[in-house]
Each structure stands twice: as C-alpha cells, then as structure tokens.
C-alpha cells in the first residue's frame, strides 16, 4: 500500500514538473494612444510623425519581439473598446458596455482577467481599465485589484511636470518623481504575489488623453513643431497651431514610453522579463483631431500592437489582421485556460509562436470595426452615430446607418455670427461637435469652416456622411477621396458591403437584427440613468 502511494506521488510530481511554466502577462495599454512609436517609422513607408517621436523603450520591445502592422480596435471609443478587449467579443455584443456615457457592465459576460485569477494568476491593475462605466473597472474585478497608492500624478504628466519645473525643479527631477509613482505601484503589486504565482498586470495610464499642458511638447521634451512639417496626415492642416498641438500629444507619448521603461526595468531587476509576455497597445487613435478618435478611418482604429515574450521570435513584422478582442483568448491560452465559446476573438498565439514574418495565417486578411454612441448629448435625443467598417489590405469600406445625423455631434452654430469662441472649442468638448475632444486643433479647424483653403478639412471632419464610403488605400492612404459612387469600383463596393453585412449577421450585431434596434432606445439613450 505504501509502495502504491509512493508511486502515485512520484507520478503526480513528475506530471506537474512536465507542465509548461505559465508566463507572466504584462499589458501596457495607454488611453487615446494610436500607433505612435519610432518602431513604426519603417512600417509607415512615407513621411510620418513616427520619424520624429522618440520611444526607446517601446522600440526595444518591438526589436526583441513582434510588431503588428494591421492591429485594429473594434471600436474607437474608450469604454466600448475596453469592453471588447476584456471580453474577447465585438463591442456590440457587450450590451450596455457598447456605449461610453452610461455604460454598465453585465457580470454574466466572462472576462480574461477574472478567468486567469480563477486559474491561479495573481492579477492587478494601475489606472484606467474600464471607464467610464459602472461598476468601475468591473470586468477586472473592481478596485479590489487596484494598485495606485504610490500616486496618480503621472496620469497628468505634462501639467504636473510643468508645475514642478515652474516651482524650481529640473525637468529630469520632475520626470523622475512622476515615474517613481509608476515603479511604486508596480512594486506594490509584485509584493502581494504569493507562492511564485504567475502574474497578470494591467498598466493603463491616461496621460495621452487630453488635456495637455500647452507647448509642453517643445518645452519639456524638445519636440520642435517645425520638425513635423510635411509629416502630418493630409486631413490635418500643416499649420503652426496644429503642429504645436500634435507636438504636445507626442510629448505625452514619450512620457508614456518612459513609464513603459520603468515597468521593463523592474521586471529585469527581478529576473522576470524573460518569463513575461509583454504587450503594448492603445485603445484608439489620436483625440481632438479630424478622422481620429470616434472615427472608423485608420487614424481612429489602427493602433500599435507589440509583443515580446518567451518563445516569440524577435525582429518580426507581422502583416496578419488582428483585432484587440483577439487578446482575451490569447491571454487565456497563454495561461492554460480554455477560452469560452462566446468569445468572437481569435487567439494570436499561433502568430506569436511562428518563426515566420509577414502574412502567417492566410485567413487573417480583414477586420470589422464600428461605433454606436460616444458622449451622451452629442446629438438630439442622445442618439448614437451607428456605423460599421470592413478593412482589408486594399480597401476601407464604411457603412453609415444614419447618414442624416452628424457624425461628430451637432454643430451648435449656423454662421460666423454665432460661432463659438476659440478658447471654448479648445477647452470645452461640449461646445460643439461633442464626439471630438476639445483641443487647439479642433478649435482651429472649426474657426476655418468657411476658409476656401480649409473648408474641405472642416467638411471631412464634421460634415454629414453618405450611407456608404469606400477608400482605395493604394491611391489614398489617408482615406480622403470617397470612391463609393465611382462606377469603376462598383464590384468592390458590392463585394465589401456583402461581406460586412454577412459578418455582422453571423456575429449577431443588433444593428443588422430586427427593428427596433436596441441602441436607438432606452436605456442606451439615457446616459444619466
């Protein structure tokens, strides 16, 4: 009997030893950060902001891991994007998680952090995970897993650093003080780890979300706005006011990179970096500018995705189309957990473990993106701006389901006589076009609404849009010339429209289901309740 027990114990021990070690997972996810890193300059293939920005820490992870060319969010709005990512499903399948203002989490929806927790992972988070919405950060287990006692001032980097410098500190000292919060919060999380458990940590600062200290790009980081000449996308006016605003955003992005560097350094110091799958991304494109946040153009939906970790061959550029909802099943697979059938995302572990670069999975040649409602009062009746898009390597097709509505919200003015003040448009989002954040760029474009040279920029940013949009990306990478009505593209239009609607029906998008569509009714149109 003793011999049998001994043999059973030895068998169990050997079986346990044979199990592959589960990696740690660190997810660095910045608010309102699109695809801005030096590592992407070689991918852009044309003059871009990535030729100017300095992101040595993000670039290091890209060089030691894999960088994705075609990574997209399911929705270019904070809460819906995060609902999708955490649940591994399209945003429109997450009920009240599909909107921003008024979002409520349905606890019956499985999420990867809580599933990893139940599988033995030590989980934790710092700063923004799922917000705005109630209960706060519910898909991550609420504030129980929050680590922020070292401070939150890093989230408003430019404002706080500028204040310290004005008080007599050097920028180096101000930067070090703010970055000490990042390390302190991460160290507190690691200190709570028990019995060598694998850990799953979410680092989600909001410094790249507006507002920024004006001129901080040049004053703190030495980013000369004139260096951006000829490097802005075509739909952004290449004028001093806009270049200065974009330089400020780039400064916050460089502060984000510095925070990522702190996390890397702490892992290295503890000998954990090579045991960790390290992922970097953002929840949508640049805020407060035309075609960015809240838009289905690439400037709003195409984001950075960079992954380093054990078994991931370094130095690869991956061309497969991926959606950030694919990360939930990916993290679960890495943690040895079977993704639930309800997840519509597909694990990218096969792409990460492949030795190939370029196109790896022949089926990954497109993604679907979309949006319903962002802020509550952008349009009368708190109505959404419903649209969906199909993106392939060659084309972007957009279906606007309510072309009579204003895509960025109501103008709230009719002529120069009642035009809002520049300062109000610069600082108060709800002044006009409330689905675009307040910014100097927004104010400049609105104030040039009747300027013959820039009227097209204003119309492209804020004007009503036709039911269908189609862009030929080889000829029009900035997606300015809509060719949906061009007979030469009739076959492409039909094919992409059909593929989009078929896909939406397959994944049970309410927008193409029975009428009335729930997103047009309470509680979705009651953001305050």
Regions found by a protein language model. Name each.
Residues 472:
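A contiguous binding-surface segment within folded domains or other stable secondary-structure elements
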Residues 505-508:
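Short arginine-rich
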Residues 2-3, 11, 16-469, 477-498, ...:
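Formylglycine-dependent sulfatase
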